[in-house]
């Protein structure tokens, strides 16, 4: 029995929100009425705009389309756009713009990201959700400390 794509999307959003909660964040599906600016699929990660994609198969072209949607939808929010995606029977991955990831990494670890040259051209980096959360947690802690110092 084929699954309705809307139901599959909701299931993916619930799964990813649970994964975020497992990492210590109070994440949940957002109330998406009509899409548009800052209509993230999942909310609860400070500073992050999350789009979730659950598909049978995801190509590199799909990832590029997904991240472009996340960028477009997050333009007015000043949040880093990410795409959490999962193919059938596989683990979760996160894709985001290379320059955004390089910035998060540099803030988190106080050293430049050496995973590749960051150029002015549009580049996307993809990693396991566990690897992404490792960097994100350090980044968030550094930003929290920085905000405390400014008070």
What are these regions (language model features)?
Residues 1-151:
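Catalytic phosphate/metal-binding cores of nucleic-acid and nucleotide-processing enzymes, i.e., regions
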């Amino acid at each position: 029995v084929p699954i309705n794509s809307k139901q599959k999307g909701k299931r993916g959003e619930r799964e990813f929100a649970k994964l975020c909660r497992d990492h210590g964040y109070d994440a949940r599906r957002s109330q998406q009425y009509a899409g548009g600016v800052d209509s993230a699929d999942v909310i609860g990660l400070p500073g992050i705009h999350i789009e979730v994609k659950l598909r049978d198969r995801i190509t590199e072209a799909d990832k590029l389309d997904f991240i472009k949607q996340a960028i477009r939808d997050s333009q007015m929010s000043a949040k880093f756009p990410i795409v959490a995606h999962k193919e059938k029977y596989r683990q979760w991955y996160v894709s985001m713009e290379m320059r955004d990831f390089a910035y998060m990494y540099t803030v988190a670890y106080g050293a430049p990201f050496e995973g590749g040259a960051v150029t002015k051209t549009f580049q996307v980096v993809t990693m396991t959700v566990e690897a992404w959360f490792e960097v994100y947690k350090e980044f968030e802690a550094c930003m929290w400390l920085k905000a405390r110092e400014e008070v």
